């Protein structure tokens, strides 16, 4: 079962801690779509708590948003009850049988396309997206804290290191849901719309350079923001790798929950040791503000 369907998964906590999309991203998406008057139908695949449908729906007559997680759909309906042109339903990108042929003007997927089973998804999208309609997939992978190489190395180790990351403590690597995570880390390089049915294919990718820390311009490196270390800590706890680790270590609780610590607590212990200026803040280290940038991709295509 996917992490998002487990009883231990909190849709509300996930939604609260995840980074938001900048306006520049939606400007890029709608600039490619290039229809000025609100008309037609938007299909939001893997809608989560409904952010994409909310932001894009003003350019459409109606929006249909689907997600496999019942908890996410309930949260989306509660959060966006006033957006009457959006309809939310539980569903999968692999089964769009509820939609007529050529009924969709844009199919969008924000931070969801790495989960898709493409041998099933491409035929469905080719059927429901009308000729001249658009496809827009985008997402983000691992972030870095700009100017903090040692913290980034520890973050990488705890997320993807093999075996034990501390004596007697295994990292999160084996608990990521694969192949989805690997597809995302590769920025969907191998996800290719069939050229027999799609054209005007465009990719915008940004792979974070952990060594030089050179940051691209805002169109390419569009997922960049300031956040506190406390917000970064909460974000890490939304990772599917973290959720999988917790499900495998039911005896572990975070210190915030009265336990002796979980994998994220242990990781930040190491990060604070590596960043003395942060450690000097004592219990107030979570208030420290840092700048972060994510590796990102945008994949755009037009139905022939």
Residues covered by each model-derived region:
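A short glycine-rich, Lys/Arg-flanked "PGG" loop and its adjoining helix->strand segment in the class I
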Residues: 120-132
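Conserved alpha-helix/loop element of class I SAM-dependent methyltransferases that forms part
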Residues: 19-40
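Class I SAM-dependent methyltransferase SAM/SAH-binding core
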Residues: 41-96
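A short SAM/SAH-binding and catalytic strip from SAM-dependent methyltransferases
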Residues: 105-119
């Amino acid at each position: 079962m996917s992490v998002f369907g487990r009883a231990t998964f909190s849709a509300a906590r996930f939604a609260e801690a995840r980074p938001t999309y900048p306006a520049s991203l939606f400007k890029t998406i709608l600039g490619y779509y290039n229809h000025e008057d609100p008309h037609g139908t938007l299909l939001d695949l893997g809608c989560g708590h409904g952010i994409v449908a909310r932001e894009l729906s003003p350019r459409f007559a109606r929006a249909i948003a689907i997600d496999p997680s019942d908890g996410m759909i309930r949260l989306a309906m509660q959060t966006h009850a006033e957006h009457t042109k959006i309809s939310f339903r539980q569903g999968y990108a692999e089964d769009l049988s509820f939609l007529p042929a050529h009924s969709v003007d844009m199919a969008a997927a924000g931070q969801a396309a790495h989960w898709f089973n493409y041998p099933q998804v491409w035929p469905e999208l080719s059927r429901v997206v009308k000729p001249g309609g658009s496809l827009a997939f985008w997402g983000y992978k691992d972030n870095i804290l700009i100017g903090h190489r040692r913290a980034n190395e520890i973050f990488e180790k705890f997320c993807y290191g093999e075996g034990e990351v501390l004596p007697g403590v295994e990292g999160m690597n084996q608990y990521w849901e694969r192949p989805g995570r690997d597809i995302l880390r590769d920025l969907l390089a191998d996800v290719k719309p069939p050229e027999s049915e799609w054209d005007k294919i465009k990719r915008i990718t940004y792979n974070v350079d952990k060594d030089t820390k050179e940051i691209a311009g805002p169109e390419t490196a569009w997922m960049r923001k300031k956040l506190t270390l406390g917000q970064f800590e909460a974000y890490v706890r939304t990772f599917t790798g973290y959720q999988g680790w917790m499900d495998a270590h039911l005896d572990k609780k975070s210190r915030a929950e009265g336990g002796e610590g979980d994998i994220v607590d242990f990781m930040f212990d190491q990060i604070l040791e590596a960043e003395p200026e942060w450690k000097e803040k004592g219990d107030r280290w979570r208030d420290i503000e840092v700048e972060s940038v994510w590796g990102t991709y945008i994949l755009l295509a037009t139905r022939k």
